[in-house]
Amino acid sequence: MMMDILMYLFETYIHSDSELQVDQDELEDELLRAGFHQDDIYKALHWLEDLAALQDTENQAAITMCSNTSMRIYTSREISRINMECRGFLLFLEQINVLTTEIREMVIDRVMGLETSEFELDDLKWIILMVLFNVPGNESAYTQMEELLYTKEQGILH
């Protein structure tokens, strides 16, 4: 599954501070040895390329800043992928200033870029972490999100 590959790559190379300059062929071979399917590997690598492309100013035309008082209206396609719990979590992260509206849109873009029929809150948390890691200047938000990901809900957050 594509999400499993993304989590594997994130934990192995990014989160562990391993060598980030890995040859793509070596990476594909490693993922094949780890038991992932070739087709899923290509999809995951393409997904990561699209994530990196969101940083390109030419590609940000669809992802623009909007007012903090504006309300995000989801399309029917987005609603079918991002359930109410996930949408509520995105709103919560905006309210506590972990996500900006721009980063929220990047997250939604990457969620919609997944080829999966099953998507739940834990998957969303990983996607948010990956997006925050990819956007420079969000170290504090990344740390907050990391704490939310690695700490199981232990009551109400203050």
UniProtKB/Swiss-Prot annotation:
Transmembrane segments: none annotated. It comes from the Bacteria. It holds the Pfam family DUF494. Belongs to the Smg family. HAMAP family: Smg. NCBIfam families: PRK03430.1 (NF002897). This is Protein Smg homolog.
